[in-house]
């Protein structure tokens, strides 16, 4: 039976969302674990997706200048291309810029998760939110972080990003559809395997997440009020939760970019592995229900 979400749940889960959305620890996994551990039931994928809009807004504000430059160059570059089609050949200044190429790289990198997320929506909500899967991925994907840090040469700069990188990191972003993997964990690990500098991979990971998370949150907004979408949250709770996630998420972005400049992503395994093992133990002894 569906229950109404309390304000305590709203605040705590929104804090968790803001803290974990950008860290490679899986925000969806943490929300699934702690909502079940503290209140005995899943808050629901739709509530999670909607409050993600708060953390998404944090990315938009934090990277506003980058986003404006990319969007502006892309629009002007497309206009130059359309002008060429009419036979009025003009300058190609914007189509030769890095920001124009970055616009296409974000679009192309978003396509895999957009297609899989849309086609696999029911599978994700009905089957992949199992706590055994979440706990297992928390542990297993930690070793991917460690391997990526050891194998990656971290020598390529932001200007050296290519369309091939965007495609590979775009498919890696699809792994975030599985709770316990982490969106940033999947894309940054792929970037490290591609020998990108850690900070470069992290910044591109943020830019790549913008279309996917924004679309996911908006697409799930009507479902958040459905009795079949997990706990029922009111409009006021969704608004407050989104605001909390925004404030905490903004601080998390600033902290993470400073952290990755001098620290390995493998450090996050020290939290992921014990948490995953602890959840497995609680499941095995019947304290938690999958």
UniProtKB/Swiss-Prot annotation:
What residue intervals traverse the membrane?
104-124, 128-148, 174-194, 205-225, 237-257, 268-288
The UniProt entry, under Pfam families, shows: BacA
* MF terms in GO: undecaprenyl-diphosphatase activity
Q: Which GO terms describe its biological process?
A: cell wall organization; peptidoglycan biosynthetic process; regulation of cell shape; response to antibiotic
Q: What membrane topology was assigned to this protein in its record?
A: Multi-pass membrane protein
Q: What is its EC number?
A: 3.6.1.27
Q: Which parts form a coiled-coil structure per UniProt?
A: none
Origin, by domain of life? Answer: Bacteria
One Gene Ontology cellular component annotation held by this UniProt entry: plasma membrane
Q: Which cellular compartments is it found in?
A: Cell membrane
Reaction catalysis annotation:
di-trans,octa-cis-undecaprenyl diphosphate + H2O = di-trans,octa-cis-undecaprenyl phosphate + phosphate + H(+)
Main location class: membrane
InterPro entries reported in the protein's UniProt record: UppP
EC class of this enzyme? hydrolase
- Keyword line: Antibiotic resistance, Cell membrane, Cell shape, Cell wall biogenesis/degradation, Hydrolase, Membrane, Peptidoglycan synthesis, Transmembrane, Transmembrane helix
Family affiliation: Belongs to the UppP family.
What is noted besides the main data? Answer: Bacitracin is thought to be involved in the inhibition of peptidoglycan synthesis by sequestering undecaprenyl diphosphate, thereby reducing the pool of lipid carrier available.
Its annotated function is as follows: Catalyzes the dephosphorylation of undecaprenyl diphosphate (UPP). Confers resistance to bacitracin.
Name recorded for this polypeptide: Undecaprenyl-diphosphatase 2
What organism is this sequence from?
Corynebacterium jeikeium (strain K411)
